[in-house]
Design a protein with these regions (language model features):
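Short alpha-helix plus adjacent loop in nuclease-associated cores
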Residues: 85-97
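Short, surface-exposed amphipathic charged segments that create phosphate/polyanion-binding patches used
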Residues: 94-99, 173-175
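Active-site-proximal alpha-helix that buttresses catalytic centers in soluble enzyme cores
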Residues: 2-6, 10-88, 116, 130-131, ...
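Short, glycine/charged-enriched secondary-structure capping and boundary segments
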Residues: 22-25, 68-72, 94-97, 122-126, ...
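Non-DNA-binding regulatory cores of transcription-related proteins
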Residues: 100-108, 113-135
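Conserved histidine-centered catalytic loops in small-molecule metabolism enzymes
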Residues: 52-72, 147-179
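Domain-level recognition of soluble alpha/beta enzyme cores
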Residues: 127-159
């Protein structure tokens, strides 16, 4: 038996399609995207989720999403912005996860669809139809090292999406959002 390692697949916050002059890579997030990611990040904070490392796509919207996570989690450790996370083949993403340091118990990957949904479905023995903007999937693995990760052996701890908080935001999260 190994110990539990947890992977958080975090889709970038809702991006702005109205800036016609911006390339896909340069699109930033919307006000709604910012608000949604602040809510999701506050949820992680209340669950005492702190990553050992954040791996983020280097697109503008992923960087802005990561900035919100860093701020709301009071995180000041390792953040790596990787070109490989910008619309990479799923197998490359799998290999990137498998290469993480064995000392890391909790790894965040901030990226894009369809790659995040595809990798989630490869890693778990269930089916997620889509990870929406600002959606977060937490997957546990009973392994000692990330290199031991295999398809279909991950177990979903939780899957949260902004719409869960559309009509009701718990008081603890509201308090954090007001800070």
């Amino acid at each position: 038996m190994g110990k539990i390692k947890t992977l958080y697949l975090i889709r970038n916050a809702k991006s702005d399609w109205n800036d016609i002059g911006a390339s896909d890579f340069e699109r930033g997030i919307t006000k709604k995207g910012k608000k949604d990611m602040e809510t999701m990040s506050s949820y992680l904070f209340l669950k005492n989720v702190i990553p050992d490392i954040i791996l983020s796509s280097c697109s503008l919207r992923a960087q802005q999403t990561t900035d919100i996570l860093v701020d709301k989690l009071n995180y000041s450790d390792k953040v790596e912005y990787l070109q490989e996370l910008y619309y990479t083949p799923t197998q490359t993403l799998f290999e990137l996860i498998a290469m993480q340091d064995a000392a890391y118990e909790t790894v965040f990957v901030v990226g894009h669809n369809p790659q995040l949904t595809d990798i989630a479905n490869l890693l778990i023995d269930e089916h997620i139809s889509k990870i929406p903007s600002s959606g977060i999937v937490s997957i546990n693995f009973d392994i000692q090292e990330w290199s031991e990760i295999v398809y279909k052996k991950g177990v979903v701890d939780f899957f949260i999406i902004p719409k869960q908080f559309k009509y009701y935001v718990p008081k603890q999260i509201r308090t954090l959002l007001e800070k």
